[in-house]
């Protein structure tokens, strides 16, 4: 298939490229920019006049719910949601049922995802067997099966000796370790930030130190072992300050925040809105603003969707009993553009947080509009406005705290491996 994407504003965040030009695609690759190569005859022309042409989005945290939780979502529904949101590559955490701790499970997931011919799926393998925090997994075998990193997902690893050994082993072979800083004891049974809203509503609190105590331990172990660690979904101002300082000292870490936490705070819980029951919890306005500044100054490397589809019944329960999580694949682009507009960040820099930077963290060939790059492309209308209507989302999970919000930026075309997989 040969495709010409004609007359669009081509944005390549990795090179800060931003100009109106044509993009030519053949055999799954971008073969030329600006002028067609000799003998090129397009089978399909996409009119991108007044549209933005950028790399397909790369999402660092998207739960696809297979295997084990198909009653919440399926690969079919969530892959459709991904490409509708312009997401062409995504990393899925290992907290499935059973967890992704055996090569066969990883291979099965990869095979199922490939058969759908939509977004690329990059599994994150379990760091410990069964995510129990006791014995480390066979990382080499999981890597051979298709894992790109190793994590405990949201399951805390309370034994620092096990964490030390896992990081030493990963460091020896150069395996990336992804961790969400969380001290389980300090936030035991908590469901909301330890602030004025939790106090007013009588919700069990999760204090800031539940993140920062764990983060301090991780940073010390990184310095001790030299492991390559990515810190997932930070939520506190103090945590961002610690990362900023660690990076200034040359400690080898990267981090991301969720799009939810870039825009929302504990105040959005209102009167027990379970759609705002998230992990980590929505924190104070001060924390939210610190995440936004961290993304702006480069302390925060990437923004993820933290896509977590939840069945409707689990969100209808009282806040403290409801299941945490929010759907996000179809909102990631618009929420990133909204942050960029509000923070007065150039479009190239805003899009870098969901394209070239997460691709760098994953270590994959993605997130670029350049000759020779894989033709994973998002074409969106930056001027289009749309209302978040949960019933119209492709994801099986309709749970979102942004229901009713008006968003900017609408995906018109998504290409994966040079094929149009979504047109809206």
Question: Model-derived features: where do they sit?
Answer:
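N-terminal metal-binding scaffold of metallo-dependent hydrolase/deaminase domains
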Residues: 1-40
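Divalent metal-coordination and catalytic microenvironments
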Residues: 8, 28, 50, 61, ...
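C-terminal cap of metal-dependent C-N hydrolases
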Residues: 318-321, 374-424
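Active-site metal-binding motif and surrounding structural segment of the metallo-beta-lactamase
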Residues: 37-53
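His/Asp/Glu-enriched, well-ordered alpha-helical/loop segment
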Residues: 200-228, 275, 294-303, 308-383
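Metal-associated gating/positioning segment near the N- to mid-region
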Residues: 49-113
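Histidine/acidic residue-rich metal-binding segments in metalloenzymes
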Residues: 136-303
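Alpha-helix-loop-beta-strand connector modules within alpha/beta enzyme cores
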Residues: 103-120, 168-179, 335
């Amino acid at each position: 298939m040969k495709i010409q994407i004609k007359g669009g504003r081509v944005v390549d965040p990795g090179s800060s490229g931003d100009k109106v030009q044509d993009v030519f695609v053949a055999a799954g690759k971008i073969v030329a920019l600006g002028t067609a190569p000799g003998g090129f005859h397009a089978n399909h022309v996409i009119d991108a006049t007044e549209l933005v042409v950028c790399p397909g989005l790369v999402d660092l945290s998207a739960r696809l719910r297979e295997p084990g939780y198909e009653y919440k979502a399926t690969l079919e529904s969530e892959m459709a949601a991904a490409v509708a949101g312009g997401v062409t590559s995504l990393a899925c955490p290992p907290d499935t049922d059973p967890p992704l701790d055996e090569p066969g499970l990883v291979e099965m997931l990869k095979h199922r995802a490939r058969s759908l011919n939509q977004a690329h799926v990059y599994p994150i393998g379990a760091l410990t067997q069964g995510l129990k925090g006791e014995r480390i997994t066979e990382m080499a075998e999981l890597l051979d099966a298709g894992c790109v990193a190793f994590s405990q997902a949201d399951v805390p690893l309370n034994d620092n000796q096990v964490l030390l050994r896992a990081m030493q082993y990963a460091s020896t072979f150069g395996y990336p370790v992804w961790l969400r800083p969380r001290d389980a004891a300090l936030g035991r049974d908590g469901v909301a930030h330890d602030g004025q809203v939790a106090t007013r509503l009588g919700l069990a609190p999760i204090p800031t130190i539940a993140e920062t105590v764990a983060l301090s331990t991780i940073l010390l172990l990184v310095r001790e072992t030299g492991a390559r660690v990515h810190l997932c979904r930070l939520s506190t101002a103090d945590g961002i300050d610690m990362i900023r300082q660690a990076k200034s000292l040359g400690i080898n870490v990267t981090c991301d925040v969720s799009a939810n936490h870039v825009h929302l705070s504990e105040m959005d819980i209102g009167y027990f809105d379970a759609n705002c029951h998230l992990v980590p919890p929505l924190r104070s306005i001060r924390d939210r603003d610190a995440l936004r500044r961290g993304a702006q100054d480069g302390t925060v490397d990437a923004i993820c969707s933290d896509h977590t589809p939840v069945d409707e019944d689990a969100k209808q329960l009282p806040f403290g009993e409801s299941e945490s999580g929010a759907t996000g694949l179809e909102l990631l682009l618009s929420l990133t553009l909204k942050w960029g507009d509000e923070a007065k960040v150039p479009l190239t820099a805003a899009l870098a947080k969901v394209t070239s930077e997460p691709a760098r963290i994953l270590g994959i060939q993605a997130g670029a509009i350049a000759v020779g790059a894989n033709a994973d492309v998002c074409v969106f209308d930056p001027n289009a406005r749309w209302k978040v209507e949960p019933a119209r989302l492709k994801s099986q999970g309709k749970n979102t705290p942004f229901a009713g919000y008006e968003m900017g930026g609408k995906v018109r075309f998504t290409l994966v491996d040079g094929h149009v997989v979504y047109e809206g």
